[in-house]
């Protein structure tokens, strides 16, 4: 291989020298032998040298192939990802453009090396991005004008940055509508196939906390996903304040007057509320209102799952009720650890056997509160339920009808209930066999509503319907008030009152110090 690389003239000179050496004598023969030995050594070294150069050539080819693959990946990345990372949606902006690719090939006697040179040309953006000094202003302006959003490159991937971190309200409302639609489809496929009408019975009367309680209840009822009629029985006759509150609900309202006024004694109030509920049941029977009857007091708290459970009742059902009896006032004595452990579970509801049928009732134990309960409305003491509360029962309205298809024999006639003037404590008085009650809420294991009685004093002053007609009187002046003359008068009055209070405090301090000194003198 080395010979093939030598020029032809050198080959001729070598051949002539070899022929001259052969024609020489004995000394020349020995020299020829030496020359032949040297030629043989050169011939032995020639294959090793050619192998070395062949391997070196192959190694250089592999290196060039690897580098060419790497450069091709870089070229592919620059061509197809530069626009996505650095370009903007504005037509006036421009991105990095690959202008030219120069390939230089250098050939030597041993190998061929290819060098790829990439030339990138960038054009200035006529609309540069906003500086970091005014990020919020620039982002707001960009969002309002519909300009491009900035990008941050991490490695080979771009991270999109919103012009403002808050979500788009249109997208939020669209997501809410999608979720609402999904929930409707889930209820349609997996919920109640044929939902029944819900009849909610609420006794109420005009008082300080009526607006508070009715507002909370009406918002709960508005979220019920079933057809609903709200039957409100008002003690002392219907009032405009109650009617205006009920009109805000956008529900089907039946506002019924009750002739008796609500008493201020808790025991009498419980009895009056029971008669009001019984009056509502008679109205339901007279109008033949079909549905499921739920007794929802205005001060109770209801779970929406309750209205799903009542759809399962056949004639009369019962749910567990949480009793919130503690007032939490500052003067209430703290309970010891032993009393806390012995405190009864504040739950009223059905108790089931192993087969899931009604076996009895779990009632609220009021013995630990003996002598500590409130007797008058507004008194700062615990208010306890009397026996089983109506709120824990659910009725099928057809149980009240005189003639109903499939009405069981263990149901009493509504006209026979309370005809002798006996007190009606709970709906079980409507049944001849109370064991036929159906336990709901996973056999009473789920608490679906909470019984609570929170009331203001009977003589408390409050605006009618909590609507303030005249402007409020200024009690404490503001630092910057639009009535400077009133502020001056009030400031003077406040200063005088503070001086009077300070004088009284000093006089009490003087009297106490004098009494201490007199006592010390007597002891001495």
From Swiss-Prot:
Name of the protein in question: Probable beta-1,4-xylosyltransferase IRX14
The gene coding this protein: IRX14
Residue ranges, compositional bias (Basic and acidic residues): 495-513
Record localization: Golgi apparatus membrane
GO-annotated cellular components: Golgi membrane
Membrane topology reported for the UniProt record: Single-pass type II membrane protein
Family the UniProt entry places it in: Belongs to the glycosyltransferase 43 family.
Glycosylation sites: 132, 135, 240, 353
Role this protein plays: Probable beta-1,4-xylosyltransferase involved in xylan biosynthesis in cell walls.
Residues covered by region (Disordered): 21-41, 492-524
Lineage: Eukaryota, Viridiplantae, Streptophyta, Embryophyta, Tracheophyta
Class in the EC hierarchy, top level: transferase
Organism: Oryza sativa subsp. japonica
